[in-house]
């Protein structure tokens, strides 16, 4: 893999996907160092991807699904501002939650953040609906994750 291809991948991929990937890998992180890399590294890679895409002419990232064209990445100046805010918040959440030792809570927190960032950058209503619902599902599991009587109420 060359540096140019890596830079192209970062610039043309929805930044939320990097946080979602970190969320999916978190349950398999067994030690503190790997958890820290995923909890903070996922949002930082998303931040690098967002900044590297600023000012470039980005090709829309589209996928054909059931006869529909899903636009998975459509950056503009407004989504840049909101995406930047979401990514910074998710990095701060990652740093703040390093004191916990619960892989489920960490994973659902990053899943929620990644789905929120993904929703900011998608370019069609179907993809927006999917990302929005993923935030709803992640928030339910975030509430239930502590597995205590308070979370069941």
Sequence positions of predicted segments:
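Transmembrane helix-loop-helix hairpins at membrane boundaries of multipass inner-membrane proteins
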Residues: 2-107
């Amino acid at each position: 893999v060359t540096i140019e291809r890596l830079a192209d991948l970062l610039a043309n991929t929805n930044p939320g996907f990097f946080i979602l990937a970190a969320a999916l890998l978190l349950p398999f992180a067994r030690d503190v160092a790997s958890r820290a890399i995923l909890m903070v590294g996922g949002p930082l890679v998303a931040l690098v991807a967002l900044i590297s895409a600023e000012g470039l002419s980005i090709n829309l990232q589209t996928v054909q699904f059931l006869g529909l064209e899903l636009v998975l990445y459509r950056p503009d100046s407004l989504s840049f501002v909101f995406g930047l805010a979401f990514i910074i918040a998710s990095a701060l959440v990652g740093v703040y939650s390093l004191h916990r030792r619960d892989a489920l809570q960490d994973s659902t927190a990053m899943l929620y953040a990644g789905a929120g960032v993904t929703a900011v950058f998608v370019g069609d209503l179907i993809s927006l609906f999917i990302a929005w619902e993923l935030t709803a599902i992640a928030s339910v599991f975030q509430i239930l994750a502590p597995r205590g009587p308070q979370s069941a109420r």
